[in-house]
């Protein structure tokens, strides 16, 4: 689960992690009033959406007087903000964060995340803050520190010193930053986060460090332990189809291709997407119907993927273990009763009750179904149908 910048900064402040003063605003008048209350002569007017790249998309502006606060707030609030993380459809800006200015002398990048390959928590830091970290990693890898932490040991001074060395900090600066990272690491672990990112982390003329931005992502499976975090959920920022799918126990993620996938099991789903890509087509979604799929959930999955107007072909790839292939077949028939299907469906069914499933589909009136003998054959059929 993701939260907004203003929510993340409130959590930071509650845990003694330095942030600049700021207030959330839901209207232009409230934005101006917040700037007045914060005081000073410079403010950042920031769009609040669950995506990065807001500045490049025009969603972050620096105002040097209250008239500019009003002008920028009126332009950003209600805009459809498109960034490299939102996709071409963008996100509607429904709230702003008005933040006090600071005398910035240097920007850094800092993140804490779970490294599944190494089975460790990893701190990633760079002297090149405020930029796309992937670009920095590609062009200047020597400017990035990657420090692994064994969760059984936790964050120690030597971890912090390794980060400070790459960032080029002096002794006093290192001491301040290491203290800040220690608090961030504790927060990350205590709140069951998947990722904590500050980009940029700034150093002021006074030599102090502040989180100028804050992005936190939490483990959905651990939210029952953190009701105060679960309350921060903003469902308006979530994809409606993904939210609806979750209500039916389906794991669905929309992508930008034209081949809809319906698969059981996350591993098989990823393999299916890989082979679709390898064949030259592009998957339109990740969809795992799970091991306990019923005809009802399969029908719902059909409804959801057919709402995507980019879809040209549906590829159903089921290996029947716990889930029975005949249930999938009945779900397909149930779905076609409620939703008109005018695009080809490639079906590969193997495993429990696969023969019964084939009989069900053969005896149906569906003329746009094509049977695949194996995964490779299915991908080839899909590619030929997409064109």
UniProtKB/Swiss-Prot annotation:
Residue sites binding substrate per the record: 264, 321-323
GO biological process assignments: succinyl-CoA metabolic process; tricarboxylic acid cycle
Highest taxon listed in the record's lineage: Bacteria
Gene3D superfamilies membership: ATP-grasp fold, A domain, ATP-grasp fold, B domain, Succinyl-CoA synthetase domains
Cofactor(s), names only, from the UniProt record: Mg(2+)
Reaction equations catalysed: succinate + ATP + CoA = succinyl-CoA + ADP + phosphate; GTP + succinate + CoA = succinyl-CoA + GDP + phosphate
Keyword match Ligase: yes
Keyword Ribosomal protein: no
A GO CC term attached to the entry: succinate-CoA ligase complex
GO MF annotation: an example: ATP binding
Positions that bind Mg(2+): 199, 213
Pfam families reported for this sequence: ATP-grasp_2, Ligase_CoA
Cofactor note: Binds 1 Mg(2+) ion per subunit.
EC number: 6.2.1.5
Keywords of the record: ATP-binding, Ligase, Magnesium, Metal-binding, Nucleotide-binding, Tricarboxylic acid cycle
Binding site for ATP: 46, 53-55, 99, 102, 107
Coiled-coil regions, chain positions: none
Pathway: Carbohydrate metabolism; tricarboxylic acid cycle; succinate from succinyl-CoA (ligase route): step 1/1
Role played: Succinyl-CoA synthetase functions in the citric acid cycle (TCA), coupling the hydrolysis of succinyl-CoA to the synthesis of either ATP or GTP and thus represents the only step of substrate-level phosphorylation in the TCA. The beta subunit provides nucleotide specificity of the enzyme and binds the substrate succinate, while the binding sites for coenzyme A and phosphate are found in the alpha subunit.
Family the UniProt entry places it in: Belongs to the succinate/malate CoA ligase beta subunit family.
Subunit text: Heterotetramer of two alpha and two beta subunits.
Identification of the protein by name: Succinate--CoA ligase [ADP-forming] subunit beta
Organism listed in the record: Campylobacter jejuni subsp. jejuni serotype O:23/36 (strain 81-176)
Gene that this polypeptide is encoded by: sucC
